[in-house]
Structures are given as C-alpha cells and as structure tokens.
Amino acid sequence: MSIPKNPLILVPARMASTRLPGKPLADIHGEPMIVHVWRRAMEADLGPVVVAVSEQEVADAVRGAGGTAVMTRPDHPSGSDRVFGALQTVDPDGKHDAVINVQGDLPTISPDVIKAAVPPFGDSEVDITTLICEITEDSEKTNPNVVKAVVGLSPGNNC
C-alpha cells in the first residue's frame, strides 16, 4: 500500500460500555467525551471524521458540535465491527483509500498520535497499522480490559 491520499477517520462509540455506562456522553469540562474525541480527530486534518454510534443521543451530541455521525446496529460485538458497519454506509464505493479507527474513549489523544498511523503505509508490505505504547502500570498488564499487542522490536527500538 502507499501513503493514503484520501483517508477516512471513523470513531466508534456506544453507551452500553460495561466499565463506564454512558461514557460517550460523560461530561468533561462541559462537553461530552465523544465531542472531545471528534475534535482531536478533526485536528489531525487527515480527512473526513465520522462518529459511528448506535444511540441517537450520541449522534445528537456530535452533530450539535458540528460533527458527522452515522447510526449503526446496537448489537455490534466490538468497536472494529461498528467501524466496518459505518464504513458500509459512509463509503460503500470504497472511495477512501484508508480507514483510521480512533476509539471513542480517548478524549486526550493528540492529533499527532492519530497522524502517526499513516506513514507506515508508505511501505508496500504494510496493509494495517496499529498504534501501541508500552504498558507501564503493573495493574494493566493483567487487566483483560486493557488491549495488548505482542511485538518484536529490533535492538534499540522502542514504542
């Protein structure tokens, strides 16, 4: 693959979180969490940003802030499935050459971190990139709710 010229950012969000029910609408300094995430994704300035939701109140919050939201089925088992469902609606003809999945519970994500997912596509052998960081909190190492990646790093290379 080559570096995307027309990427699409999709942000999955759902109210039925088991760890923090209602988290997309959690108030952070007077605004819903999902609005903060949408703004960070917009600030990355990579392409259109669409929030994939299954509840009207989340869509209303995003649209009220000037964003775009698309309704998805409420029974998607994961955020990745919600992104795929939204992609079928938003880009059925595949006009976007990459999809960047920014999770809806990252209100402090830096736009530069979102941008960091793009350059690896310049390598013709790369079809997917995933941003990771080293787990530094011992409690997170065994927490099943913390996503983990196993990687092989060359000497001197770190996250």
List PLM regions with ranges.
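N-terminal glycine-rich phosphate-binding loop and ensuing alpha1 helix
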Residues: I3-V53
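Residue-level signal for alpha-helix termini/capping positions
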Residues: M42, Q88-P92, G122
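Conserved core of the sugar-phosphate nucleotidyltransferase
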Residues: I109-C159
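Short beta-strand segments
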Residues: P12, N101-Q103, L131-E134
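Short, high-confidence coil segments that cap the C-terminus of an alpha-helix
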Residues: L46, G94-H96, D123-D127
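Short phosphate-binding loop-to-helix
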Residues: V50, Q56-V102, L106-A116
